[in-house]
């Protein structure tokens, strides 16, 4: 599959920066709890007779110290051991997900729930199960575990007459080199700008990114 190619980024990432250095021991304990709550994410990629499939991992992965560039390519044998990884650098915790596990919303819910459990264990804080934080001791609902493609795709036949997808232009970097652009924006100003345009913050950022790519 495409995920095996070194020039293809097979992971995406969500990170959070706290005000104190991360306690990796507590984070490992919080990850154990969170991984049990998300059986559809705590998985590894396995090869079947005809196709690949996802299988629950028998053991939660170890917390890794981040020593290289974010989103380093994951060799396929690593994905077959565990399809996500948790990395720590000083007071930042990041979770990198194999692209087939979930979308950005599901990944954000996982990270927020992990942080809620971490804060609970580390500081005794009671973080309610709301606003993207799931109850850590609850079992996953049937809706979380189902393959929703069949429900929403239905019996609509696939069309071969699809328009060509947009392709980025430019010269690719060699040897997996990545250029990272980091910026900090005051949340209140960002929300005010989104409100001015009648859109959500997510829609505003996506539109800005697409405009930047197009230009």
Can you say where each PLM-predicted feature lies in the sequence?
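Non-catalytic N-terminal regions of enzymes
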Residues: 1-143, 191-195, 202-215
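Flexible, P/S/T/G-rich "lid" or insertion loops adjacent to the active sites of thioester-utilizing
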Residues: 146-199
């Amino acid at each position: 599959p495409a995920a095996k190619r070194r020039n293809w980024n097979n992971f995406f990432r969500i990170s959070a920066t706290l005000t104190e250095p991360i306690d990796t021991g507590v984070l490992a304990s919080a990850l154990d709890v969170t991984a049990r709550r998300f059986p559809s994410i705590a998985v590894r990629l396995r090869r079947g007779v005809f196709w690949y499939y996802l299988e629950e991992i028998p053991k939660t992965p170890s917390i890794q110290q981040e020593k290289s560039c974010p989103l380093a390519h994951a060799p396929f044998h690593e994905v077959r051991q565990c399809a996500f990884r948790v990395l720590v650098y000083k007071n930042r915790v990041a979770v990198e997900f194999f692209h087939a596990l979930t979308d950005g919303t599901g990944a954000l819910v996982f990270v927020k729930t992990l942080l809620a459990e971490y804060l609970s264990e580390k500081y005794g804080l009671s973080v309610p199960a709301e606003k993207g934080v799931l109850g850590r001791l609850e079992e996953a609902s049937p809706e979380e575990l189902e393959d929703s493609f069949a429900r929403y795709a239905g019996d609509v036949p696939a069309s071969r007459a699809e328009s060509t997808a947009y392709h980025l232009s430019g010269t690719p970097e060699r040897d997996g080199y990545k250029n990272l652009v980091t910026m900090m924006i005051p949340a209140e100003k960002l929300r005010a700008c989104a409100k001015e345009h009648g859109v959500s913050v997510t829609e505003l950022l996506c539109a800005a990114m697409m405009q930047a790519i197009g230009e």
